[in-house]
A protein has these predicted regions:
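Hydrophobic/basic alpha-helical segments
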Residues: 1-206
Length: 206
């Protein structure tokens, strides 16, 4: 299928761009602005501002970040960490993981997985959007195997995964690998709301 221009997918073999320097710079600007008015805000209000001005930027088209080197993800994680510390008025020496869990904020890498898997769920369970349903398919072995009824996806062959640099970032590949790694009870969830809730709990436990 032709490459899509939506945020869900930019073509199955198109490598995603690195995190935008402008996005990181703008997000840090909003974090600094929030820190200046934080003494006058309740924690709930500060959290709402951070979600609206900072996390929304980190989440925009974040499915395209799947498969990027960890060093590039760290730039975005630094933004989220700074926002979390401002909201909770934590010190730089405080460990960030409990702070993020306290706010119910998944780390950036897990937010990317959450977005990719949510798109995969819609493709598998709701047969939409069409440009994604064409890229993944349920695993149907030729012989009767126990794995046949476990809602697994078929891993793309070497023709799709052409190179380590690009092919493994393709939605058809990375969504399949992430999906098959989920516990069976999450894969077999029927509603998107239940799936997202269970998925978030699972990702927090990793």
């Amino acid at each position: 299928p032709p490459p899509s221009t939506t945020c869900g997918h930019s073509g199955d073999h198109t490598p995603p761009p690195p995190p935008s320097t402008t996005c990181v710079r703008t997000s840090f600007f909003h974090v600094r602005s929030l820190s200046k008015i934080r003494p006058y805000l309740t924690r709930k209000a500060a959290c709402s501002v951070a979600v609206s001005l900072v996390l929304s930027r980190l989440d925009y088209c974040n499915s395209l970040l799947a498969g990027l080197p960890q060093m590039q993800i760290k730039r975005l994680q630094a933004v989220q960490n700074a926002a979390a510390r401002v909201v909770t008025r934590s010190r730089k020496t405080d460990h960030i993981t409990p702070i993020l869990k306290q706010l119910h904020w998944l780390p950036v890498a897990e937010r990317v997985k959450h977005k990719v898997l949510s798109l995969a769920f819609r493709a598998v369970r709701e047969n939409r959007p069409a440009y994604l349903t064409d890229l993944i398919r349920l695993y149907c072995p030729s012989r009767s195997l126990r794995s046949a009824d476990q809602s697994l996806l078929a891993v793309p062959g070497p023709r799709v995964v052409k190179t380590k640099r690009y092919g493994q970032r393709a939605f058809s590949y990375i969504a399949t690998i992430l999906w098959n790694a989920l516990p069976r009870n999450i894969r077999e969830t029927n509603s998107i709301s239940s799936f997202r809730s269970s998925l978030k709990t699972f990702l927090f436990s990793q």
